[in-house]
Structure formats: structure tokens, C-alpha cells
Amino acid sequence: MRHGNVPERVELLVIGAGLAGLACARRAHDEGIDVLVLDAADAVGGRIRTDVIDGFRLDRGFQVLLTAYDELHAQVDLDSLDLRAFKPGSTIWNGRSLETLGDPFRNPSAALASARARVGSLDDKLRVARLRRRLLASPAEDAFEGPERSTLDELRAEGFSEAFIDQFFRPFLGGVFLERDLETSASLFRYYFRCFAAGDAAVPAEGMQRLPEAMAEPLEGRILLETSARTISDGQVTLDDGSTIAAGQIVLAADAHAAAELGGTSPPDFKPTITSYYSARSAPVTEALLVLDGEGSGPANHVGVMSHVSSAYAPAGQHLIAVSGVGEAAQDAASFPKAAQAQLTRWFGPEVERWDHIKTYEIPYALPRHPAGFTEHRPPRRAANGAWLAGDYTDFGAIQGALRSGRTIAESLMQHLAEVPQ
């Protein structure tokens, strides 16, 4: 899949080998369309990449896939990913102690401890149960049919206390939305909340990059890496080396900013995140649970011991710890690693000082912003130069959104081809 001989013409040229581009190319390829995928990077995946450093598997930013995503089941052989799941629930630093909120519906033995956990009130926890039951009673897409308001307004309307919102929802959803102000559309809150209730948060045993690699396997020989597109004009793509490819249809599935430059569109606003990885001889917690900053002091928002989720993430005898920040903390890579360790010393004790920093990933364009009403302001399906647009920013910022955008664009362009006289 490296840079090779560039054909003069293809039926479909997909620019970008992230999830959206791969989903589009696979759907078209399955229908017998002659497709070629270009990407400037040295591997498929887009924002979903995994680096191996001294035996540690470092995803480029903390990432998980939710097994409740229906596009995953439709497009990927999940058994081939050897998925390893986080334990349902989370551990929360409330400013004084670490408290664990389990999922009593999926782990009944956690019910008593969760009820006693000093996070929110019993009424808050009963409201979570009622909300869970209500959302699971309807199809996932119904989440987008409810009131259009911010997540914060939704939580208040549901009757949750401010203390529970601050201690649980802000850090938990902060890790999902990459913002703790909870300005993200309530429709996405309802959708994600249902997904977490209906399935697992998981990673492939050998790192998140296994997902795009598995998607790329049926496209062997149809992907050119380290190949950049410079311009698009009149159904022709000019590459950085000056060569050209004519294409019957062109799909821009590159990252939103590159797509905007090639397509002449305006890029959407994005949210940043940052993840520092550390190695340690002993883990700060004993289970594969996310640990959340319910105090709100930062800079770390959530912590995951990846070696508890999959032993392949770290060499034998070592643990890999992922520490992530959002908002302002995500924009200060120079100070984040040490500041996060200082913060986590309060949570876990002096052992944190002996963690060895491996690498920090600063990701300025991690997720598109989706405020209330975002579905009414999605980008057009085609750019002014005729290229089709695919990517999570055209649907919603998630693996589900990326996969669905790629598939639906492939189906739209195939319908277009069927309707246009040849």
C-alpha cells in the first residue's frame, strides 16, 4: 500500500484513508467500482493511529470504540479485532477520596458499593437508572429526535443535582465530548448514554490502529500511501509530484482542514485534547475502570490503565497509563505531563512520582464542535468543485459518524451514477 504506480484514470478516487475514506472505498469496491484511495500519511487510519515505543502501544490520543455502534457491526469483523473492554462504570476522585460507580445492571455485585459511593445522591443514581431504561427502550436514532438544547440544560431538565453533574457528568462526558462545559448537543448525550448502556467501551488488543487496518484489508493494492493531492479541477486530481489522475467521481475524506483547502469550503470548529503516556511497575488501580476528575482541578480529566484493558499494550512486568486533558489543559503540552503527575499524586499517592513519561500527544483537531442545533448546519454533501465530502465532521464526531458518512456518501454517488446517462 505504499506509493506505487499511479493510474491515469479511475472510476472513484478517494482522498484520505481514515475511517470515512475506507468505509466509502469499501462500499464502492463491494459494488464492483474501480476505486483508488490516496493518503499523505505512511499508514491508514487518519486520526486513529497506534505507535509502538519500547514495547508500549500508544494510541495517538486516548480512544475507544463503542460496541453498540451499528456501523461497526455492519462494516467490520469485530472478532478479527480481538476486542478488550473496559469494565462498565468509573472511579471518581471527588476531592477527598476515590469512589467507584459501577453499572449494577451489567454487574449486579456493584450495586451496593455504587449506592454508597460518595458521588451524588441516591436520587441522582435512581435518575440515572430511569434515564437508562427510557433510552434503551427506543432505537438509538431516536436520541436525535428529542429536545434540541445543550447537554447541561438536558441534565438539569432531567433533575440531576449540580453536585452530581460536576462530579460525574462533567468529567465523564468531558472525556467523550472533549469539553467539560457540556455545551455539546443533548442529542449526542442521549445517543452516547444509550451506547454506553447497551455495549462496551473497548479497544482492539493490539491498539486502535487495528480498526482501520482491518477495514483496509479488502482494499489491498487499491491504496497509495505517502501520496498527497495538491488540487482538484474538472474531475482531475493533481498530486504533489505534478502527476495527475482523472476520476469519474472524487471523494474528499481527508481531515476537515485539508478537505476545506482542496474543496474550497470552510473548515468547522474543532476541540483539542492531549494525552500523556507513562510506564509504571505498579498500576494505580486494580481494575480496567476509567478514573475521572470529579473535583475539576485539572489538568487531567481522565486516566486509564491501558495494560489492564489489554496486556499487549505494555511489556511484561510493566503497566501503561494514559492520562488525558481537555479544554485549556489540552493546549499546553509543555507543562501537562508534570502537572498531571502532580495532580495524580493526590489521587494515588507518591508512587505516581516514579512513573516514567513516555510520550505526549497534543491533538488540536480531535473532534468537531457540535452545539445544540448542529444537525441543521452540517456541511454540504458536495464541494463547489464537485467532490463529495465524507468525514465525521459531516455527520457527527465519532467512529460511528465517520463510518456512516463514508458509507452514505458511497451510496449517494452510486445512486448519482445510476441516474446520470453514461
Q: Which residue stretches match the model-derived regions?
A:
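Glycine-rich FAD pyrophosphate-binding loop
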Residues: 29-53
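Glycine-rich active-site loop/strand segments that organize a redox cofactor
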Residues: 49-68, 130-143
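Mobile amphipathic helical/loop "lid" adjacent to a hydrophobic cofactor/ligand pocket
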Residues: 72-73, 82-182, 197
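Helical element adjacent to the flavin cofactor pocket in flavoenzyme catalytic cores
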Residues: 190-239, 245
